[in-house]
């Protein structure tokens, strides 16, 4: 499923869209981890900038990337007008690399390398804005044709207003679009595949697509897919977060890190406060941060790492920011983002459960 977008080159206004069913040959596979240091905003806007060892396949599409970056910035600015405030990428994405296993299944003893990819980098922005255009365009198109889809919506950006999944094309305040379907990652998410089936019906049948689409309005199976996906996606995210936490704690041990700079972001259990490390993907509770506001920056002494429960505690050594000057506070994300953090694993053991007798484990 391809979306073709016609853009006025001078004004960057989208003047038309067309969806096609086709096979698309890949001319160049551009990877963030290999090219972000080359594809900077300066490189895209100033043709005189030349960087040593730039791949020819990248030079061949430099003009196209420059235009796409201009378009992406314009699209982002338009969404921010609808949102009412700019999007902030205060925290980076982290990449993990395990050295020493030659691509085999990890054993837990590998050397961990953690690198940073700043969100909002030019290539990242181009891809993100293209996906938003596709997902919002297809979502609105399905709604116009009366074809149900699976949407994510958010009524407002007021505190406590969460993102919801449903079958109606409703505004997504957090993104700043009239509707937002998930359709651009069918290999990664089943919901996207379902939406693409609906979009294919729209392409093939036009105004009669609602009669031919696999899922009809108020289809109980569609609601069941949403319910099942929510549970599966939460479980997937939890597993991913736990896995990243394990390797982050291994990194802390391997590098002999005993102190970290961190930022307070919310109250934790037992009178502790949760902090987020400034330079690692790590959230943990600390003692001694009582009555400190969100955004307070601290130097923290780390306790022992528990590799079974993935637990780690810290103690405040000193406050690094000026209490009377908010300009040096640490980054504070939206409340919903703060909820998606990985913490220790809770282990429940039934001491009354009788083990099955076997030659290796005879009954008493």
Where are these regions (language model features)?
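Electropositive polyanion-binding surfaces
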Residues: 1-296, 305-312, 327-344, 348-364
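Short, compositionally biased
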Residues: 314-322
């Amino acid at each position: 499923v391809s979306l073709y977008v016609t853009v006025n080159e001078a004004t960057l206004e989208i003047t038309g869209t067309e969806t096609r069913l086709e096979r698309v040959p890949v001319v160049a596979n551009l990877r963030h981890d290999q090219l972000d240091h080359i594809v900077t905003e300066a490189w895209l806007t100033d043709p005189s900038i030349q960087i040593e060892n730039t791949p020819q396949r990248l030079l061949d599409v430099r003009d196209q990337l420059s235009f796409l970056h201009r378009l992406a910035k314009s699209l982002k600015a338009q969404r921010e007008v609808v949102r009412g405030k700019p999007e902030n990428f205060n925290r980076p994405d982290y990449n993990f690399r395990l050295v020493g296993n030659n691509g085999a299944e990890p054993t837990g003893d590998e050397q961990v390398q953690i690198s940073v990819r700043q969100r909002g980098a030019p290539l990242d922005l181009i891809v993100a804005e293209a996906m938003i255009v596709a997902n919002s365009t297809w979502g609105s198109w399905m709604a116009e044709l009366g074809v149900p889809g699976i949407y994510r919506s958010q009524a407002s950006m007021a505190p406590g207003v969460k993102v919801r999944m449903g079958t109606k094309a409703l505004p997504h305040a957090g993104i700043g679009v009239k509707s937002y379907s998930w359709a651009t990652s069918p290999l990664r998410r089943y919901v996207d595949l379902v939406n693409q089936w609906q979009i294919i019906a729209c392409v093939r049948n036009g105004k009669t697509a609602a009669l031919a689409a696999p899922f009809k309005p108020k289809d109980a199976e569609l609601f069941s897919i949403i319910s099942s996906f929510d549970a599966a996606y939460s479980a997937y995210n939890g597993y991913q977060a736990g896995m990243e936490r394990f390797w982050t704690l291994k990194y802390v041990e391997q590098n002999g890190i005993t102190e970290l700079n961190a930022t307070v972001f919310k109250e934790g259990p037992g009178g502790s406060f949760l902090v987020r490390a400034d330079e690692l993907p790590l959230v943990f509770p600390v003692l001694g941060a009582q009555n400190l506001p969100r955004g307070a920056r601290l130097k923290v002494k780390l306790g022992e790492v528990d590799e079974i429960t993935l637990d780690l505690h810290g103690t405040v050594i000193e406050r690094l920011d000026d209490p009377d000057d908010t300009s040096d506070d640490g980054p504070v994300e939206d409340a919903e983002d703060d909820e998606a953090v990985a913490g220790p694993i809770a282990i429940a053991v039934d001491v009354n459960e009788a083990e099955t007798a076997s030659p290796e484990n005879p009954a008493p």
